[in-house]
Amino acid sequence: MATAAAASTALTGATTAAPKARRRAHLLATRRALAAPIRCSAASPAMPMAPPATPLRPWGPTDPRKGADILVESLERCGVRDVFAYPGGASMEIHQALTRSPVIANHLFRHEQGEAFAASGYARSSGRVGVCIATSGPGATNLVSALADALLDSVPMVAITGQVPRRMIGTDAFQETPIVEVTRSITKHNYLVLDVDDIPRVVQEAFFLASSGRPGPVLVDIPKDIQQQMAVPVWDKPMSLPGYIARLPKPPATELLEQVLRLVGESRRPVLYVGGGCAASGEELRRFVELTGIPVTTTLMGLGNFPSDDPLSLRMLGMHGTVYANYAVDKADLLLALGVRFDDRVTGKIEAFASRAKIVHVDIDPAEIGKNKQPHVSICADVKLALQGMNALLEGSTSKKSFDFGSWNDELDQQKREFPLGYKTSNEEIQPQYAIQVLDELTKGEAIIGTGVGQHQMWAAQYYTYKRPRQWLSSAGLGAMGFGLPAAAGASVANPGVTVVDIDGDGSFLMNVQELAMIRIENLPVKVFVLNNQHLGMVVQWEDRFYKANRAHTYLGNPENESEIYPDFVTIAKGFNIPAVRVTKKNEVRAAIKKMLETPGPYLLDIIVPHQEHVLPMIPSGGAFKDMILDGDGRTVY
């Protein structure tokens, strides 16, 4: 067995001598292969996969290696093929170890917030755990918004941070922040690793926690001296999560599912209210709708979980949902709430929401059941298992249960005809809704769509056709501006060959504009679709409606020359060597979008739209369906 010192020397020599071209070719080959499933998951928490042998690692199974290498090998054993990591003093050892990995590719974003949003986009679009890595201090704190976002939107992520050496913890050392304490309330769980021998177990637990039950972010903080310490890893240590595993939801009882189906049989006006918790249940949901004929509305997080072009789709409900979706929920006598949390942007005035309906709430997280709206029947279970169980009961029934909701669906079809989504048109100005409709038409509704936060986000939700789960990526619960570009890039990494479009606003886009560098360097085919109104559009809309149009720092252009488009995103994009075009007239839009989609690699399209446009319909905050606003814009005095 090699000594620790000899192994350390051999390790350093191997790193400096490793041919970069060979490793790059290996990684490219891996990139083309389908990503392996996460082994450290709820389905198979104790099935570690040994990493392949490689000359980059000059040690045998029983030889010591650095803690950082144990960490990277642990990630490999959990099926990780991509990480989003930005180096710094306290994480350098991890980056050195990554250069010795034959299978993990690092995607170098230019800001830790960008890399963490990319990990989120990667996870949202693929269902796999997204991994981001940052240094201590400001590197770690730059992850905070993305961790909070992932917790609210139930995104499986593992964030790994470097930390100052153990002996310096608590001394206010350079770039020291107590990131475990900082993130305690915005992660599902977090760890401070104080023993190098704990790394394999902690990583396995982190992936299991992130991906099981209600998914969420887990943070692992590793001091630098632990990363440098030599040790022989023990890979078969069992996880130590007895309380957590015992509380994981069990398959739903057949008696409860039969009770739900009895309620469906007694109902005349049922509605399915579907959220992000159905992302893994699209097939089961479609089958349930086929068997019952119940109309479906989705939350912002639920877009794509049921095809929005299906005749039984009511599209999105809530503050900026369709009239007919909100009408259906208001008139319903039965509301089947699947994988939702009765968020305030959906319910408005909670007492008035679905006030005529019996409510069935199915969710994997017991904390969500009864938190905002008390259900008549609650099932704490995986929605996928609940739907599978109900489908089996429906398909196996000797009497072949049949439901007739024809008159109810006819009533809703009439609402669709009377109150379709719409907007005012003009000959010259480009309506943002029109631009998205053209994008939808030219991509045939097949693109993965990422967005920032604001008016453009709502228009993208309303006017693009979402046909499958994991097609829509947006910061829903936290509402974090700057999410769109890095999330789209992360989705592009996870889904090579798939068209990915970042529908963004000028305000959101500018918050992480530096990530144009990364998509250019890796030549990711991310199409940046900026709806540029020179304002913080959603805040302007609220100023128009509720503050007598008094502008309070919502203009983002140049006050000394308001006719100028400022900043010039076309010039900025070209500075990153990304082709870019600006369009200002409606008759230019179709050809410009077609060129964007046909151009290989990244592309930016700057679409100038009027700032007076409002997102409609709109239910004011705290309002009810009866308070819905259907017309007007910034050209109107309120």
From Swiss-Prot:
Subcellular localization, as worded in the UniProt entry: Plastid, Chloroplast
Gene Ontology cellular-component annotations: acetolactate synthase complex; chloroplast
NCBIfam families on file: acolac_lg
Protein name: Acetolactate synthase 1, chloroplastic
Pathway participation: Amino-acid biosynthesis; L-isoleucine biosynthesis; L-isoleucine from 2-oxobutanoate: step 1/4; Amino-acid biosynthesis; L-valine biosynthesis; L-valine from pyruvate: step 1/4
EC number assigned by the record: 2.2.1.6
Cofactor(s) recorded in Swiss-Prot or TrEMBL: Mg(2+); thiamine diphosphate
GO biological process: isoleucine biosynthetic process; L-valine biosynthetic process; response to herbicide
Organism this protein belongs to: Zea mays (Maize)
UniProt-listed PANTHER family: ACETOLACTATE SYNTHASE CATALYTIC SUBUNIT, MITOCHONDRIAL, THIAMINE PYROPHOSPHATE ENZYMES
Name of the gene this protein is made from: ALS1
Presequence range in chain numbering: 1-39
Enzyme class: transferase
